[in-house]
UniProtKB/Swiss-Prot annotation:
Pfam families for this protein: PhaG_MnhG_YufB (PF03334)
Membership in a protein family: Belongs to the UPF0091 family.
Gene Ontology MF, one: sodium:proton antiporter activity
Species lineage: Bacteria, Pseudomonadati, Pseudomonadota, Alphaproteobacteria, Rickettsiales
The protein's name: UPF0091 protein RC0354
Organism this protein belongs to: Rickettsia conorii (strain ATCC VR-613 / Malish 7)
Alphabetized InterPro entries for the sequence: PhaG_MnhG_YufB
Domain of life where this protein originates: Bacteria
Amino acid sequence: MTLYYIGILLVIIGLFAIFSGIIGFFRFPDFYTKLHAASVIESFGVPICLIGFACIAADIVNSVKLILAALLIFILNPVATHALGKASLFMKIRADSTVIARKITK
């Protein structure tokens, strides 16, 4: 029963991180800060929710699958976000979001 409440708490923390990342994504002015907000959602919010769901799950097999998925997201998502940021720097995309819109339409 205690594990159930720990799982609920982890899901609430993960949802708070997702919600704050969504607010940051829409409020931040430029591409690189929006990239940071999106990485917070994917790198912290989703895995914490998955670990919370693993605590709530009744079956041990499903719990292990959820924990493995959370570990993969913890490891792979920062690498993908770094690659996206480095590629945008390589293409000399400025932080101004109007430049990105013009490069996409070309």
